[in-house]
């Protein structure tokens, strides 16, 4: 996709319903770190946690509400504004998840973004029909364990593997049809 915002982006779709689609770009780090974010919102990390999260980058989640934070994380804890995406992933828009992180009671793994990606009803479907996006399955491993650089590579390789299988299937059908 040749778009200044979404070109090369890997978007994790959190919700898709009759109102549209909500997703988070997961492979475009900003120059902000968790340390800077916590300073800006006046939260102090407990000393034992500083080294674990201080250098983690904040992602550019998308152009919608790019003045707000959004957190993809492993489930657990009671946060005031959370959406269960899968059994392994939750999406929280309230500051209490970051307060829990600061106190040492936060989620095991997380990805923090500024902004999110949103599509109106039918918009993403139209972009998919025009081959504007490649779609692959995702899981907590992709979100929380892969280095940022590998997100795009893994997604691209998954798509290439699927494309190769489809081409092989098409070739095999043509070959076997020619034998009749």
Residue ranges and their predicted role:
Residues 1-180:
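A short aromatic-anchored loop/beta-hairpin motif
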């Amino acid at each position: 996709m040749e778009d200044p915002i979404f070109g090369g982006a890997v978007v994790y779709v959190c919700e898709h319903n009759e109102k549209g689609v909500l997703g988070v770009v997961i492979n475009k780090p900003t120059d902000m770190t968790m340390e800077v974010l916590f300073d800006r919102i006046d939260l102090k990390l407990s000393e034992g946690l500083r080294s674990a999260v201080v250098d983690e980058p904040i992602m550019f989640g998308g152009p919608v509400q790019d003045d707000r934070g959004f957190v993809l994380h492993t489930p657990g804890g009671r946060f005031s504004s959370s959406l269960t995406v899968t059994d392994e992933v939750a999406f929280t828009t309230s500051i209490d998840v970051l307060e829990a992180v600061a106190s040492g009671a936060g989620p095991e793994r997380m990805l923090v973004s500024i902004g999110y990606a949103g599509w109106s009803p039918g918009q993403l479907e139209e972009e998919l029909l025009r081959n504007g996006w490649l779609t692959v399955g995702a899981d907590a491993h992709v979100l929380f364990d892969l280095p940022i650089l590998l997100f795009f590579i893994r997604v691209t390789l998954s798509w290439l593997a699927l494309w190769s299988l489809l081409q092989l299937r098409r070739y095999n059908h043509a070959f076997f049809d020619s034998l009749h």
